Amino acid sequence: MSNYFQEFPVVDYKFGNEETTTRFQHLGTAVDILHQVKEYAVYYQKYHIQNGERPEQLSYKLYGNVNHYWTFYLLNDHLRQGGWPLRDADVYPKAQEYYPNTVLAVDGVAMQQELKVVLGKIVWLPTQEYLPMTKSTVFVTGNYLYFPNSKVAGKILKIDQKMAMIWTDAVGVRGVDTQCVAVTAEEGLAVIADPEYVPVNQYAIMQIEKKWDEFDAPHHYEDVEGNWIYPSYSTTFPNPFDHNSVNTMNSVSYYQRLLNTNEVQKEISVIKADNINRVVSEFNRLMRSSN
């Protein structure tokens, strides 16, 4: 804890995505007067945080004192909001931790099913009724997906209609599954409990075009100018999507986005060493006058 602020109230504060909290002065007070301190902007300089460099280490490197680390957070909004940058080697495992689910690119067409008698058995078979995913009442967040060949099921966590993509917490979905089946939560949970269980009610199916681990899935697609683009779709009902209209050259994965964001976090403003004591003293004065 910095010696300069011991007289002020402290709270357990979590910076961005940091896993642990830091005992830090109440940021409500600090941020309220930050605009007054920024009159010292002429005394700042840009700094690129080195791989693995921690706040206290950088404070000592710049000022010969570990207690000035707090200035980095107060001067840089993105550090307060997003946390201190990760070590490069930690970005990939952190992406796997942050994005643990399965993502499906689908054709966006729900093929309805109905019960029929085949060779004396009652089975669910496709009808000739097709609906865009936007109009489906079963391919919705909160329902479950069943993957017959993999014998697994999972909850629908999110649907992006513009990208024709579905997020699910299903574990163990294999490439042999080219279709997913919409089932109720009750039946999805039954499959999770017993992989040999076959759902009785299989209301609709949808074609799977691509499958990714979430961290490796497209967060979005970009053109050469960095503008976001989306898979094209047919103007003819039921409006199937064409995922070949975008490719890996256009894709920015969740991992790549985290990597890019981590690089941005490394670019900060720091107070020049010959001005640090003056700025800190003035900041302390402002803190006292605000109480």
Predicted features and spans:
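Cell-surface/extracellular proteins and modules involved
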Residues: M1-N291
